[in-house]
Structure formats: C-alpha cells, structure tokens
Amino acid sequence: MVNQDEPLFDRNSPMNSPQDSDPTLRDRIRRLVMEQEYAVLCVQGGGQPYGALVAFAFSEDLRHVVFVTPTATRKYRLLSECDHVALVIDSRPNKIDQLMDVEAVTATGRSHLIERGVEFDELAELLIARHPYLKSFVQATTCALFRVDIVRFFHVVRFQEVRQWIPTDHC
C-alpha cells in the first residue's frame, strides 16, 4: 500500500534518509514543539490550501498532537472533509539579525475527531494542562477536539537544511 504522506525527498539521498540517524534530531524537535505554544494548522479543501493558528499539545512520545476548534468554522469543515494535515511550528525571532537561527518543524499526519468519552477526557486534559485558559473552550459543546497521528516531522534550520524524523514505538 502506498503511504499517502510520502515526502518529496529522493529516497536514495543520504541526507534525506527516511529516518535521520542523528539522535539529537528528536531532541531538537521535542524542544521546539514543547517551547512553542502555537502552530499553523494546514488543511485543504476543494483543491485550495488553508492555514489556521491553533494552540496545541503533543503527547510525550511525539506521536500525537491535539487541538480544539469551534464546530462552526471553515477549519472544522475542512478537517471533516480531508484528514491529511500538517502543523508548522517555528522559533521565529522578532529581530532580523536572528533570522538564520530560526528552526521550523512541519509535522504531517492524519486528523481524527475525538468523540466525548474516555479518550476525549484524556486528550482534553493534555491540552488544558498546557493551555489552562482553554478549559471552558475545550469543554464547550460547540467545540471539537482533534488528535493528529503524526507520520513524520520535517526539521528545517537555516532555511534550507532539511531533515526528517519519523516517530516510532522506540522514541
């Protein structure tokens, strides 16, 4: 079966191996996603891309990320139509002289609407622990909680050095 989330990298390039062997790459990705509180959620619909800012929380193993959105939004509708998503998280500075220090991660995966129940409660707790101000928003019946199962991360430094990391059971 073809993975619908295949990267554009040439599989034979040593620089772009499916699983980067640098043990610090996972740690750099972890640090970045734990330090930043917001991501740009990238979705698509009708052949058009759409980006939206979301507050997020990753699972400890980096295999899942969770966010909440109102159900009466374009974001919710597009997530309901297509589960292929990406989240872009970066360390963008406010000063131009720090521009080459920017790191960015694109996490690609499949989104899942989480129905109220045990899993909803566990994931809501994860998100609220990171963003306590979202508690009433997360619990509102007019909002939906989504979990994204991460397929891979693309880590970028200095605007052109790209490596990928795939979370596994052995993270």
Q: What spans do the regions from the language model cover?
A:
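Structural motif corresponding to alpha-helix initiation and N-cap regions
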Residues: 26, 72-73
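Short, intrinsically disordered, mixed-charge
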Residues: 72, 81-85, 125-133
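Charged, gly/pro-rich active-site loop segments
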Residues: 2-21, 100-171
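Short, basic/aromatic recognition patches
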Residues: 18-39
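Short N-terminal helix-initiation segments at or just after the protein's N-terminus
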Residues: 1-7, 28-32, 48-58, 86-97, ...
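Short beta-strand segments
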Residues: 36-71, 77-79, 87-91, 97-99
